[in-house]
Structure formats: structure tokens, C-alpha cells
């Protein structure tokens, strides 16, 4: 479907502004009526994950990137969560602020009141959005977007393992344990997530074959392996993962050809950095 860029951005801008005016959701939301991650997989057969939001139209891990992904119908929105200096849960892939903000500081060096004054210097759509809308969002603000649009929160925890429990506490407070996904490159984070929450779907990023049995034993789990070229994926690998009751994805579905190959391989969900190639 062809999307009119100007009209789409106008609608998304209004939606972002409305979220900002409302403020962060302060009362527990009812997640009981929402479809679980497993139900969505069963219904669709394949789910697409907007990696760090819709990076085609807004800088990564910003409220506009999350809203654009949701309004384009992406079933899940991925973000990265870590602590600020004062212990706030914020959305930022990098610990360093150099790449996205041109600042030679770490996220953990600054309180959130300082972080929220920063404006990205890198990314698409820098001039499409008021600067105040591009500030580093809190984890709660990200969840507000996911709840508003009934998108799956696909949450990657970063940094110290201590971040996992407060992330899951907030997910549980909103009634989203059976809807959200907790992912991490760190296997310790994934195991901690299962210890803290028996319901949430856990996903191990760039897993190793020797970790498959332990991951399968956790139940309700998925993984990705680090294959940059799909032609090098061993024959039968997807089937062997599925045989253990574990879901699987590979990175990243950024071209129609790659997506078609991933579907042919029988993968369960596809992260994408190019969510709107038609815009």
C-alpha cells in the first residue's frame, strides 16, 4: 500500500502531541483483554517487529519513531531499556551518547532531567518533528504508545542485570506480562526475566547452539542466531529449534527479498529497520 508521506506525518505528529499532552499513564492498564504474544503468532503465522521504532521516518528510540511504527501497523515495537544515573528507566540503544547526540558522555553519567534536554543529531526525519518531541523517552512513555495502539512491547534490556526486575515490574503493573516480550543479548538477563516472571515471552539475541536446551527448559521462549547472510544458515536449523519448542528469528528483514526468504525458512517473527520502504 502506498502511503502519502505528508498526510501520514501530519497524523502521526498530532498523535505524538496528544500523547505528550496526556502525560505518562499513571494507573495500571487492563491487559487482560489483549491478545498474548503467542496468540498473535498463531493468528498471523509471522509477526514484524519495528526495530527501535520506525527508523525510516524518525530517529531511533523516540516517541515519533514508536508512533509511526504503530500507525503503520507493525505488530511489535522494539526498544532498548537502561538506567539513567538517577535510576530512571529510559530508552536508548547505546550507553554512549556520542553516536546519536554528539555528546562524549554515557547515559549513566546523567540524570534523566539532563538526558531529556538532549536532541538527536543523527537519524531520519530530524526536521519533520519539533525538537521537544525527539527527547529521550522514558520506558513508561514507550509503553503508553504500545498500549494505545495495541502493539507488542518488544523490550531489550541493556546494561546491568538489575534493570530486568523494574522493567518487568512495570510491565506487570500494566497487565502486559502475557503480551510483552523481554529480550537481551545477555543470557543472564533472559534467565533473570524468567525468574521474575513466569508468563512473559523471553527472547535471547544472538544465542549459541549450546544454550538451546537451557532456553527451551525456561518455556515460552525464542532466540536469534547471528547469521548476517541467510545463505549460510545450516539446513535444518530452524526445524531443530522448533523441535525444542522454541521460536526463532534472524536479523534483519530490510528488503523484500530477505523477508521472502525468511518466510520461506519458516521463521516466526522478523525484526526490520526499514519498516516503510514505500514511503
Which residues fall in each region the model found?
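N-terminal secretory signal peptides and thylakoid transit peptides that target proteins
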Residues: 1-16
